Amino acid sequence: MFAVIKTGGKQYRVAANDLIKVEKVAGEAGDIVEFAEVLMVGSTIGAPTVAGALVTAEVVEQSRGRKVIAFKKRRRQNSKRTRGHRQELTTIRISEILTDGAKPSKKAAEKKAPKADAAEGEAAKPKKAAPKKAAAKAESAE
């Protein structure tokens, strides 16, 4: 069975175990991501999306595409400009295509939440205030 998903402003035709490169998706290698914008599953066409359909995928790697050079030259003006751009891409492997609100066999990992809690715990501990020097001078003057 195949599905058409929408991510990064583009549409991709995917099937189970497909390996595709899409625009950057948040996550590290090994994370599970879910695509809820499923436009078509098999012969079922959504309007605009198929209700209850979900595609899960595993992030294989985060990479960058080839460099695209934007070169502009104004003839006879001694004026030119060169700029380069490398698009960030994510390689994903499609795990499952689910329909009718079925639950994925692997849950999407939420690793970022514990890291944020640990950072908040460290930030919540106030540092001890330095002793006031003005008070120390006042005591020595007496």
From Swiss-Prot:
SUPFAM superfamilies per the UniProt record, alphabetical: L21p-like
UniProt keyword annotations, A-Z: Ribonucleoprotein, Ribosomal protein, RNA-binding, rRNA-binding
Compositional bias annotation for Basic residues: 73-84, 126-135
Gene responsible for this protein: rplU
Coiled-coil residue windows: none
Keyword rRNA-binding among UniProt keywords: yes
Name of the protein in question: Large ribosomal subunit protein bL21
Subunit structure: Part of the 50S ribosomal subunit. Contacts protein L20.
Family annotation (InterPro entries): bL21-like (IPR028909), bL21-like_sf (IPR036164), Ribosomal_bL21 (IPR001787)
GO BP annotations, alphabetical order: translation
Source organism superkingdom: Bacteria
One term under GO cellular component: cytoplasm
Annotated region described as Disordered, given as residue ranges: 73-142
Keyword RNA-binding: yes
GO MF entry, a single one: rRNA binding
Functional description taken from the UniProt entry: This protein binds to 23S rRNA in the presence of protein L20.
Entry's family note: Belongs to the bacterial ribosomal protein bL21 family.
Compositionally biased tracts (Basic and acidic residues): 107-125
